[in-house]
Amino acid sequence: MVSDEDELNLLVIVVDANPIWWGKQALKESQFTLSKCIDAVMVLGNSHLFMNRSNKLAVIASHIQESRFLYPGKNGRLGDFFGDPGNPPEFNPSGSKDGKYELLTSANEVIVEEIKDLMTKSDIKGQHTETLLAGSLAKALCYIHRMNKEVKDNQEMKSRILVIKAAEDSALQYMNFMNVIFAAQKQNILIDACVLDSDSGLLQQACDITGGLYLKVPQMPSLLQYLLWVFLPDQDQRSQLILPPPVHVDYRAACFCHRNLIEIGYVCSVCLSIFCNFSPICTTCETAFKISLPPVLKAKKKKLKVSA
């Protein structure tokens, strides 16, 4: 049996840093801005690290152009994750100016530095304005897989992903998103979702399939309270708490032709691609369907009457 000392708990937080959505929030003169969202994320991360000294944290920003690790930063190494000697200043600072726990202070500084660099140096070009959420989740899974390889023989690591979603879903990412969901399910990784704006059908499916929690925040300025109440406890602790009831899951699929969510469609019998309109040839695997037509009845010849 693995003791609490040997059980690692990794929390990967994926933050939606879509500059267009957050820019619209700023134009509305909203009380809730990206900086306040990052502040709430840092408090959640600090609380997670403070719950147990074996708890681990990673934060990923999901932008419209890239997915970037906010923590650990660019100078982080695999050895640093498990407390090996030779840590850089990012993980083992020489001292804390205000007496705070050094790891919490360094984590906050790295997150603030990385998010500022991401938002100031990004140059928005073209028509692509959708958050690369599927890629960020794939990056989180790769990170968890890499960390699992570094776990010692006498240790066990439980991992979960928390997505803080702001912008709307992207139907173009449907296939990649579903692949990520089933990969997480196979690795027993929970996906939780905290949605700030409109509901996300894709994240509802992700939470339902992996056993995570889905919550649409009623009031965005109260984000921190919901993060600490709902998403700070791990899977074992949640059974002892009164949490929001599960929501109705929208299991509509996106068609491969127009990426629209549909309830009834045509499915290719070879590659299982979904289409909203019938096509004699599958555009995915180029299979030609044999169309069974009704039998054609030959017209009966009329008998000519012979005149007497």
UniProtKB/Swiss-Prot annotation:
<dbReference type="GO" id="GO:0006355">
    <property type="term" value="P:regulation of DNA-templated transcription"/>
</dbReference>
<keyword id="KW-0227">DNA damage</keyword>
<keyword id="KW-0234">DNA repair</keyword>
<dbReference type="InterPro" id="IPR036465">
    <property type="entry name" value="vWFA_dom_sf"/>
</dbReference>
<keyword id="KW-0862">Zinc</keyword>
<dbReference type="GO" id="GO:0097550">
    <property type="term" value="C:transcription preinitiation complex"/>
</dbReference>
<dbReference type="GO" id="GO:0005634">
    <property type="term" value="C:nucleus"/>
</dbReference>
<protein>
    <recommendedName>
        <fullName>General transcription factor IIH subunit 3</fullName>
    </recommendedName>
</protein>
<keyword id="KW-0479">Metal-binding</keyword>
<dbReference type="GO" id="GO:0005669">
    <property type="term" value="C:transcription factor TFIID complex"/>
</dbReference>
<dbReference type="Pfam" id="PF03850">
    <property type="entry name" value="Tfb4"/>
</dbReference>
<comment type="subunit">
    <text>Part of a TFIID-containing RNA polymerase II pre-initiation complex that is composed of TBP and at least GTF2A1, GTF2A2, GTF2E1, GTF2E2, GTF2F1, GTF2H2, GTF2H3, GTF2H4, GTF2H5, GTF2B, TCEA1, ERCC2, ERCC3, TAF1, TAF2, TAF3, TAF4, TAF5, TAF6, TAF7, TAF8, TAF9, TAF10, TAF11, TAF12 and TAF13. Component of the 7-subunit TFIIH core complex composed of XPB/ERCC3, XPD/ERCC2, GTF2H1, GTF2H2, GTF2H3, GTF2H4 and GTF2H5, which is active in NER.</text>
</comment>
<dbReference type="GO" id="GO:0008270">
    <property type="term" value="F:zinc ion binding"/>
</dbReference>
<dbReference type="GO" id="GO:0005675">
    <property type="term" value="C:transcription factor TFIIH holo complex"/>
</dbReference>
<feature type="zinc finger region" description="C4-type">
    <location>
        <begin position="268"/>
        <end position="285"/>
    </location>
</feature>
<dbReference type="GO" id="GO:0000439">
    <property type="term" value="C:transcription factor TFIIH core complex"/>
</dbReference>
<keyword id="KW-0805">Transcription regulation</keyword>
<dbReference type="GO" id="GO:0000438">
    <property type="term" value="C:core TFIIH complex portion of holo TFIIH complex"/>
</dbReference>
<dbReference type="GO" id="GO:0006289">
    <property type="term" value="P:nucleotide-excision repair"/>
</dbReference>
<keyword id="KW-0804">Transcription</keyword>
<comment type="function">
    <text>Component of the general transcription and DNA repair factor IIH (TFIIH) core complex, which is involved in general and transcription-coupled nucleotide excision repair (NER) of damaged DNA and, when complexed to CAK, in RNA transcription by RNA polymerase II. In NER, TFIIH acts by opening DNA around the lesion to allow the excision of the damaged oligonucleotide and its replacement by a new DNA fragment. In transcription, TFIIH has an essential role in transcription initiation.</text>
</comment>
<dbReference type="GO" id="GO:0006281">
    <property type="term" value="P:DNA repair"/>
</dbReference>
<dbReference type="GO" id="GO:0016251">
    <property type="term" value="F:RNA polymerase II general transcription initiation factor activity"/>
</dbReference>
<keyword id="KW-0539">Nucleus</keyword>
<dbReference type="GO" id="GO:0005654">
    <property type="term" value="C:nucleoplasm"/>
</dbReference>
<dbReference type="GO" id="GO:0006366">
    <property type="term" value="P:transcription by RNA polymerase II"/>
</dbReference>
<comment type="similarity">
    <text>Belongs to the TFB4 family.</text>
</comment>
<keyword id="KW-0863">Zinc-finger</keyword>
<dbReference type="InterPro" id="IPR004600">
    <property type="entry name" value="TFIIH_Tfb4/GTF2H3"/>
</dbReference>
